[in-house]
């Protein structure tokens, strides 16, 4: 059997092929379907190792279509790089390392997200970009009108245009901000369409629908969590999910000294951000159905350690609850969070 290491790049990639006779063949090709097919399409079935990256999924599917066995490897798995030169890094060396790791099995396969969840992630990324862009426009418009002694009343982003229209701004000032207002109108419409699509996902997807029963977890956060985790069964417990989302403290230990720092911030940034935002929302609301136990728990932490620490702790708690709901096929039950209830520990 042939073993192939493929070091993927955005525009070009390095290929290292070890034939059945032990000969090494090295090529540099463009990261395009035609080039991959031309080089590897006529070769006998081989095992190909590539690192998880932006391009890895479509490349893996294309190579599998050519009859090869493709492994997408976790780039953080240290033994895969045991043969790598520590001070010299080149694409050719990386491809050789991947080829050798493929031959001896020194790799850990990364989880390959389903097509459905990959498309949902793309929708979430587009929505997030639109929301952030709208926030920049709001900030800029606010700064422009303040320079002229005007102030836009506070309120939701979605109703910002109505608040601006209600102001009797001078003609020259309205002319200056008109291009931004026009762009914001288009953004509002597109964000509304994106939200409608997410609402439909919640209605049609039983898992996301259950996740959305947790206080503070709306359609966007529930969908992002489901799209990031993909399969609850691939995790051994809530602790592993928290670590996967970068919500656990970094640990720097040596000998008898143990030190824990800030959260690791590993994994999907979008899902982690949304969970922390959900925690902040719970901390700030006065009352809500089923949210009192969670908010009370976080408020006690805030009193001792501050609100920022409490928000992250609550995000960790929410992560555990969401995972337990998915794993057990349940819906949120605030009674499980009452003091003395052992199942609450399992859920969180």
Set out the residue ranges of the language-model regions.
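Short glycine-rich, Thr/Ser-proximal phosphate-binding strand/loop in the N-terminal lobe
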Residues: 12-35
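Short alpha-helix plus adjacent loop in nuclease-associated cores
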Residues: 71-118, 122, 160-168, 257-267
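Basic, amphipathic alpha-helical segments enriched in Lys/Arg and hydrophobic/aromatic residues
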Residues: 301-348
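Acidic beta-strand-to-loop metal/phosphate-binding motif
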Residues: 46-53, 98
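Short, basic/hydrophobic alpha-helical segments
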Residues: 32-47
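Glycine-rich, often acidic, oxyanion-interacting loops/wings at catalytic, nucleic-acid
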Residues: 124-210, 339
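Gly/Thr-rich phosphate-binding beta-strand-loop-beta motif of the actin/hexokinase/Hsp70
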Residues: 1-18, 98
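Phosphate-backbone recognition surface of nucleic-acid-processing proteins
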Residues: 27, 210-213, 219, 224-303, ...
């Amino acid at each position: 059997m042939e073993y192939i290491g493929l070091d993927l790049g955005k525009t070009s990639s390095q290929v290292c092929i070890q034939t059945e006779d032990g000969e090494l063949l090295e090529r540099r090709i463009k990261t395009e379907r035609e080039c991959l097919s031309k080089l590897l399409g006529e070769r006998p079935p081989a095992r190909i190792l590539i690192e998880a990256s932006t391009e890895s999924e479509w490349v893996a599917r294309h190579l599998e279509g050519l009859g090869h066995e493709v492994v997408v490897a976790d780039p953080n798995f240290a033994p895969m790089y045991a043969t790598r030169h520590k001070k010299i890094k080149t694409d050719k060396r990386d491809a050789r390392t991947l080829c050798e790791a493929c031959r001896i099995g020194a790799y850990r396969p990364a989880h390959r997200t389903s097509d459905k969840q990959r498309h949902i992630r793309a929708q979430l990324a587009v929505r997030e970009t639109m929301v952030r862009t709208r926030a920049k426009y709001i900030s800029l418009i606010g700064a422009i009108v303040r320079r002229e002694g005007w102030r836009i009343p506070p309120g939701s982003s979605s109703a910002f245009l109505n608040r601006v229209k209600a102001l009797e701004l001078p003609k020259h000032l309205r002319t200056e901000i008109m291009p931004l207002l026009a762009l914001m109108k288009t953004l509002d419409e597109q964000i509304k369409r994106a939200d409608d699509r997410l609402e439909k996902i919640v209605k049609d997807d039983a898992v996301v629908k259950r996740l959305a029963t947790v206080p503070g977890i709306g359609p966007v956060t529930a969908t992002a969590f489901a799209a990031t985790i993909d399969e609850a069964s691939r995790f051994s417990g809530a602790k592993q999910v928290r670590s996967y989302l970068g919500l656990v403290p970094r640990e720097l230990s040596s000998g008898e000294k143990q030190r824990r720092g800030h959260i690791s911030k590993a994994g999907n940034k979008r899902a982690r951000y949304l969970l922390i935002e959900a925690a902040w929302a719970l901390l700030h609301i006065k009352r809500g159905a089923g949210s009192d136990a969670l908010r009370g728990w976080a408020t006690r932490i805030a009193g001792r350690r501050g609100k920022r620490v409490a928000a992250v702790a609550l995000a960790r708690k929410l992560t555990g609850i969401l995972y337990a709901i998915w794993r057990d096929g349940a819906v949120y039950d605030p009674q499980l969070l009452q003091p003395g209830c052992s199942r609450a520990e399992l859920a969180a």
